């Protein structure tokens, strides 16, 4: 069986194998919503599902690498050192001078705090762009009444 016959995700010339979802389970029947129930339609549905899962997985990797929770060498933003990677090296190093490492951690924390603050500002700007809720029935009724009173006033003035 070829590797593409198994669940997989492509990532920059790398094939990442996914575990099949139904291990050690009895045979299940799946219904696909298509006009013709042939093999090609089933393959198309599975490819769509594979693409959705793959895009979700790659998105999670991007978010994790952006915050430094995991290192993704293919992404430029994750090439920055991370607080979490430095913590690993501190515990491995043992009896080394910790003051230099503490300074490094402080700068890394400040860098990650600026990232978080910039994201908070972006979220705030998006919240400001969100339109308010639509008018309620009472507000529409009040607006109609005020427009009608303006019309009546204009009729009285004009004659």
Swiss-Prot record:
Origin: domain of life: Viruses
Purpose of the protein: This protein is involved in virus transmission.
Family from the record: Belongs to the caulimoviridae ORF II family.
Protein name: Aphid transmission protein
Classification of source organism: Viruses, Riboviria, Pararnavirae, Artverviricota, Revtraviricetes
């Amino acid at each position: 069986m070829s590797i593409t016959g198994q669940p997989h995700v492509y990532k920059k010339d790398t094939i990442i194998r996914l575990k099949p979802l139904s291990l050690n389970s009895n045979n299940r029947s799946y219904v696909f919503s298509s006009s013709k129930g042939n093999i090609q339609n089933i393959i198309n549905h599975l490819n769509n599902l594979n693409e959705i899962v793959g895009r979700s997985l790659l998105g999670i990797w991007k978010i994790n690498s952006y915050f430094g929770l995991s290192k993704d060498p293919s992404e430029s933003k994750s090439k920055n050192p991370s607080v979490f990677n430095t913590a690993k090296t501190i515990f491995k190093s043992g009896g080394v001078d910790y003051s230099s490492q503490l300074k490094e951690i402080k700068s890394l924390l400040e860098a990650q705090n600026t990232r978080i603050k910039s994201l908070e500002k972006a979220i705030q700007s998006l919240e400001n762009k969100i339109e308010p809720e639509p008018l309620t029935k009472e507000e529409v009724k009040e607006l109609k009444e005020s427009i009608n009173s303006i019309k009546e006033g204009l009729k009285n003035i004009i004659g």
